[in-house]
Amino acid sequence: MNNKNDIENKCLERGVRLTDQRKLIAKVMSESGDHPDVDELHQRVNKFDSKISIATVYRTVKLFEEAGVVAKHDFKGTKSRYEKA
């Protein structure tokens, strides 16, 4: 498996349809060395494509979570953070 974009690979294995925007979000998440929240992820994705909205990032992260390719972590008093599952 290509570690550079293992989220994309897992999506393909699970039959998740990947648009160009979803591929970019998967790439940014896969290459992340930390556990970003959606706002941080949106800022990083916007460096590559400023047309991707925060709503698109939220929907995509939720889709990835439901497909079991990312894990959501809730910490008391902070925003949810995400990592590769």
Describe each model-derived feature in a short phrase:
Residues V57-A67:
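Basic amphipathic alpha-helical segments that dock to polyanions
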Residues E66-A85:
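Non-DNA-binding regulatory cores of transcription-related proteins
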Residues L18-D20:
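Short helix-coil-helix linker/hinge
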Residues E31-D37:
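Short capping segments at the starts of secondary-structure elements
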Residues M1-G15:
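Short, Lys/Arg-enriched N-terminal segment that forms or immediately precedes the first helix
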Residues D39-S50:
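DNA-recognition alpha helix
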Residues K23-V28:
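Pre-recognition alpha-helix immediately N-terminal to the DNA-recognition helix
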